[in-house]
């Protein structure tokens, strides 16, 4: 597991109040992890803070699973 992947999973677990073991790549925030729309907004903000990136609203709406969040972070974090 990459450092970015581990950090994303930790943030998701903290933001959604679930065990880190439950946060697997294929899980959807709403359907599988019980997030609501406010949770997803707060999650995006936490990812922005953690990685020092800005996620535009139109991109944030597409980030609906753990893997999509990991991919977005990997593709947008400056090395």
UniProtKB/Swiss-Prot annotation:
Keywords: Cytoplasm, Fatty acid biosynthesis, Fatty acid metabolism, Lipid biosynthesis, Lipid metabolism, Phosphopantetheine, Phosphoprotein. The modification O-(pantetheine 4'-phosphoryl)serine is found at residue 37. It is found in: Cytoplasm. The keyword Secreted does not apply. Residues 2-77 form the Carrier domain. Belongs to the acyl carrier protein (ACP) family. HAMAP family: Acyl_carrier (MF_01217). NCBIfam families: acyl_carrier (TIGR00517), PRK00982.1-2 (NF002148), PRK00982.1-3 (NF002149), PRK00982.1-4 (NF002150), PRK00982.1-5 (NF002151). This is Acyl carrier protein. It comes from Leptothrix cholodnii (strain ATCC 51168 / LMG 8142 / SP-6) (Leptothrix discophora (strain SP-6)). The gene is acpP.
């Amino acid at each position: 597991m990459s450092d970015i992947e581990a950090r994303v999973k930790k943030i998701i677990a903290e933001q959604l109040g679930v065990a880190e073991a439950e946060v697997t790549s294929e899980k959807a925030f709403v359907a599988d992890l019980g997030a609501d729309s406010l949770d997803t907004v707060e999650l995006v903000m936490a990812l922005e803070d953690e990685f020092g990136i800005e996620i535009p609203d139109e991109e944030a709406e597409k980030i609906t699973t753990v893997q999509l969040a990991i991919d977005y972070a990997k593709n947008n974090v400056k090395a």
